[in-house]
């Protein structure tokens, strides 16, 4: 405050007086220089002296103006700071007044209200009576509670009597049919066909139960034994007088010893034989086609073969009245072969029970059949093939590039496609067929 007062009373008025004095002094200097330049004989010297006065006068005036300007700016700064302090004081007074007004308003509002006493409590309150902990009781785990849930196949254990075996139904769907490619070529480069249901096998109308026969023991039997997974078949045929050949279907059940579980063996179906009138009913092995058949000699028999797992004991049982017989479907349209050789089948001592397995619902079975191509392949068989399979269901082709076959037909597989279809040769004809309608053939010899 004293500084501002000194500026206002002393320095700023002193600067103004100095400027007025400089003004009057400059007028006198100007008159002197003019007269000196006119009267002096040395014009050059007079001119130089005039220049020196002019420069000094300009410097003096500039200094005085600068001093006065600084004093004025300093005065303005001091006044601005004082104004800020005054503004702050006024704001403080205004806030104080507002606070006082709010207090008065709250007091007036409080007069119109009543006091309420609130008790403070904890957010979590412990229960007054503690619950007794429940004792843990262990319950056994039921591993079969989810057996009927989902799309899995539930296998039921069946007590199979000797000689009886339920027929397996054919698959309801076959693999996606391959497209119709070029002329006669087999390919899978076109879109697949839609899945079509396959009709199940039907028992023929001329089904005749087998008559009761006595089984005579023999040392040799022209049959092959092979084990399959839960499917046993014995193929036989009975002749009738008058040249008629009624087809019958039978199945026999055998329990093999250890080593016969889990070996998948396909079962071929023999072709219909030709039995002359008067010949007794007899068992016989599936004959070769007429094109490769040689008349057997009476009393002769094929060498007996059995798998190594049941070399000790073999049981061939045929049921009376219920003895299942399989229908003999022809493999080709060749003439019927000559009458077969009488080959009695005998019963040996029952085999030992199978060893205990982890899976109780799967049982090993022995299938007896005679493979017509066991010794050598027919002339129409390809030189190189992947495996030889036998049809386990009847199949009728839907397109020209497929094969039609009946149960027991022998097919030589030359290619396996990724979509489940096989390419094979049957009776000299090459075509496609579903892979789930056949099973592989495995031969065992001593």
UniProtKB/Swiss-Prot annotation:
GO terms for cellular component: adherens junction; cytosol; dendrite; dendritic spine; filopodium; glutamatergic synapse; lamellipodium; postsynaptic actin cytoskeleton. CDD domains: SH3_Abi2. PROSITE patterns: SH3, T_SNARE. GO terms for biological process: camera-type eye development; cell migration; dendrite development; learning or memory; lens fiber cell morphogenesis; neuron migration; postsynapse organization; postsynaptic actin cytoskeleton organization. Pfam families: Abi_HHR, SH3_1. Residues 159-366 are annotated as: Disordered. Belongs to the ABI family. This is Abl interactor 2.
